[in-house]
Structures are given as structure tokens and as C-alpha cells.
């Protein structure tokens, strides 16, 4: 492990210290390592051709005009990406769906964009992880 020195302005250091405390890090180095790993992983998933895993989560109104069938159609069109799906009934009108995906990150992003762009889908979020060799 290498020791490096960085310079941060006071406001940024205070923000880092607050984040470290909220997340329970023992020291700044642990927090900075995790932040850096996250940024590097996100960057790696932006490269077309990169293989990886992702979690797509979203809320949708199950009775919205044909929305459920459009989402299922999109899922079947990208069936090669889907590893597993969890479906939760939040209330009478809304469902939470969580899909674990695996494959080319460009294809995963395209699938996520197709789902999230559907009218009636809310709170869409894609978390990508590059495949580690």
C-alpha cells in the first residue's frame, strides 16, 4: 500500500469528514478508497464492450395503461441480460421491481433506459459493477 498526500479545501474536507462519520469509516483513508473505487468502477462500466453486472430498480404503476405488458415485453426482448427479478407490491397501485442483470454494459444501459423511459415508471436507478477477473 502506498501513502499519498492530497490537498483539500476546508469545505470539501468537512464534507468528507461528515460522510466518513455517517457511514462509519474509521478514518479518512478508508472513505477515500471506497469513493475512489466507486468512481473507477463507474468509469469502467461506461466503456462499450465491458462485461459486468447491474441492478436496475424502479417503481411503476401496475394499472397504468399497458405499462406492465410493455415492461414485460422489454424484459423478454433483453432476456439474455436478466439473471433474476424481484417484484414487490408496495401498495394497491405501485410495484417495485428489482432486476439483476449481467452482460455487456452498453446493452445493460440500453435496457435500463428503455424501462426507465416508460410513462408511469418512477425512481429508476441503475447501479453497475464491472466484472472483475
Curated annotation (Swiss-Prot):
| Protein name per UniProt | Nickel-responsive regulator
Family designation: Belongs to the transcriptional regulatory CopG/NikR family.
Record: residues binding Ni(2+): 76, 87, 89, 95
The cross-references to SUPFAM superfamilies, in alphabetical order and at most eight, read: ACT-like, Ribbon-helix-helix
Q: Name one Pfam family in it.
A: RHH_1
Query: Which keywords accompany this UniProt record?
Result: DNA-binding, Metal-binding, Nickel, Repressor, Transcription, Transcription regulation
Q: InterPro entries, per this entry?
A: Acetolactate_synth/TF_NikR_C, ACT-like_dom_sf, Arc_rbn_hlx_hlx, CopG, CopG/NikR_regulator, Ni_resp_reg_NikR, Nickel_NikR_proteobac, Ribbon_hlx_hlx
Q: Does the UniProt entry include the keyword Transcription?
A: yes
- Give cofactor(s), names only: Ni(2+)
Segments crossing the lipid bilayer:
none
Which organism's genome codes for this protein?
Salmonella paratyphi A (strain AKU_12601)
Amino acid at each position: 500500500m502506498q501513502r499519498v498526500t492530497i490537498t483539500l479545501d476546508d469545505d470539501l474536507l468537512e464534507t468528507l469528514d461528515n460522510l466518513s462519520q455517517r457511514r462509519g469509516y474509521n478514518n479518512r483513508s478508508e472513505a477515500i478508497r471506497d469513493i475512489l473505487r466507486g468512481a473507477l468502477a463507474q468509469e469502467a462500466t461506461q466503456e462499450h464492450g465491458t462485461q459486468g453486472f447491474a441492478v436496475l430498480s424502479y417503481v411503476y404503476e401496475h394499472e397504468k395503461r399497458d405499462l406492465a405488458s410493455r415492461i414485460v415485453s422489454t424484459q423478454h426482448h433483453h432476456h439474455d441480460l436478466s439473471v433474476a427479478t424481484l417484484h414487490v407490491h408496495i401498495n394497491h397501485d405501485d410495484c417495485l421491481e428489482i432486476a439483476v442483470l449481467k452482460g455487456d454494459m452498453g446493452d445493460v444501459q440500453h435496457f435500463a433506459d428503455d424501462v426507465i423511459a416508460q410513462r408511469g415508471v418512477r425512481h429508476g436507478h441503475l447501479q453497475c459493477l464491472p466484472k472483475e477477473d
